[in-house]
């Protein structure tokens, strides 16, 4: 989803401008990953100068850390909200799962977290990835009250959702009945229809990427 930019000559309060830069960073890091992203690309997406980005965050590393941490913050906030007032374990899983699907329809959040969780080898970001993943686990288990096994199953389903949406399978589901069958096992009918509508807003896949692949 495109972020709103200020009109020419309009000045935003510092807090709003920071939010604007972090929203832009989420999109740029999501699309390009940490290595491919640049502070210049984030600056252009946010409608500010590169110098302003660096002055605000200090470095690309610091910007990435804050961006991914905020993505995890949003994820945890969604889980907490969905869990409020829910009593049965089955309803809890259903409500939080539905809320998560709606959240990661934002590809910036989805892909930024996916990039982070593949960086366990990274000198600086490896520990961050482990800490943020376990932060989610601890909220689900210790705060919301899910059992360790239920939490494991929920996280596994979440990672499957991440993979399916990251590959943009919902964009090409009409081309392959097996994809439709898989998606029907993962998402509700309402979720599938919603994701299909969102897929129409994506940059179209190249024709060669839309056909069915066979071995």
Task: Indicate where each model-derived feature is located.
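Short, intrinsically disordered or compositionally biased N-terminal tails of bacterial proteins
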Residues: 1-5, 215
């Amino acid at each position: 989803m495109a972020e709103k930019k200020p009109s020419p000559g309009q000045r935003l309060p510092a807090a709003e401008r920071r939010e604007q830069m972090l929203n832009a960073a989420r999109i740029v890091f999501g699309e390009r990953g940490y290595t491919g992203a640049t502070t210049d690309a984030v600056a252009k997406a946010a409608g500010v100068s590169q110098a302003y980005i660096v002055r605000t965050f200090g470095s690309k590393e610091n910007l990435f850390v804050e961006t991914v941490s905020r993505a995890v913050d949003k994820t945890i906030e969604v889980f907490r909200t969905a869990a409020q007032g829910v009593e049965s374990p089955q309803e809890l899983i259903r409500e939080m799962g539905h809320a998560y699907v709606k959240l990661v329809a934002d590809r910036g959040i989805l892909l930024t977290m996916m990039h982070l969780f593949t960086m366990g080898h990274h000198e600086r970001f490896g520990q961050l990835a482990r800490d943020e993943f376990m932060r989610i686990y601890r909220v689900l288990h210790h705060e919301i009250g899910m059992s360790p096994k239920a939490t494991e199953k929920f996280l596994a389903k979440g990672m499957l959702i991440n993979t399916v949406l990251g590959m943009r399978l919902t964009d090409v589901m009409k081309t392959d009945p097996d994809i439709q069958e898989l998606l029907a096992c993962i998402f509700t009918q309402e979720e599938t229809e919603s994701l299909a509508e969102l897929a129409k807003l994506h940059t179209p896949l190249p024709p060669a990427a839309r056909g069915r692949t066979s071995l």
